[in-house]
């Protein structure tokens, strides 16, 4: 028997219900900044999940962009290397 089946049988009592999934999707939807997803209309779970993935990707891109800008600023600033090292250590 595969370990996946074993785990599935062992955790049978802890399976997530459709209601719990719906609640989690609703919570995800509340976290999304998209105004169009905030309507009271029922939005398909697949759309909420897709929008969540898109939002996470955009956040990753924003972090990358800000990190690059910060690196450029640190490289051109007049601060001492000790000060720059402190700032870098705080950011990592």
UniProtKB/Swiss-Prot annotation:
GO terms for biological process: brassinosteroid mediated signaling pathway; regulation of DNA-templated transcription; regulation of seed growth. It is found in: Nucleus. GO terms for cellular component: nucleus. It comes from the Eukaryota. Its main location: nucleus. Keywords: Brassinosteroid signaling pathway, Growth regulation, Nucleus, Transcription, Transcription regulation. Pfam families: bHLH_ILI. Residues 5-59 form the bHLH domain. PROSITE patterns: BHLH. InterPro entries: bHLH_dom, HLH_DNA-bd_sf, PRE. The keyword Nucleus applies. SUPFAM superfamilies: HLH, helix-loop-helix DNA-binding domain. GO terms for molecular function: protein dimerization activity. Residues 1-20 are annotated as: Disordered. Atypical and probable non DNA-binding bHLH transcription factor that acts as a positive regulator of grain size. Binds the transcription repressor APG and forms a heterodimer of antagonistic bHLH transcription factors that regulates grain length and weight by controlling cell elongation in lemma and palea. May be involved in the control of lamina inclination through brassinosteroid signaling pathway. Plants over-expressing ILI6 show enhanced bending of the lamina joints and produce grains increased in size, caused by elongated cells in lemma. Interacts with APG. Belongs to the bHLH protein family. This is Transcription factor ILI6.
């Amino acid at each position: 028997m595969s370990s996946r089946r074993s785990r599935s049988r062992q955790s049978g009592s802890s399976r997530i219900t459709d209601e719990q999934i719906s609640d989690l999707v609703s919570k995800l939807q509340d976290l999304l900044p998209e105004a169009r997803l905030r309507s009271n209309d029922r939005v398909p779970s697949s759309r909420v999940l897709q929008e969540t993935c898109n939002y996470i990707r955009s956040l990753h891109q924003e972090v990358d962009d800000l990190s690059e800008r910060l690196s450029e600023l640190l490289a051109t600033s007049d601060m001492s290397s000790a000060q720059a090292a402190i700032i870098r250590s705080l950011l990592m």
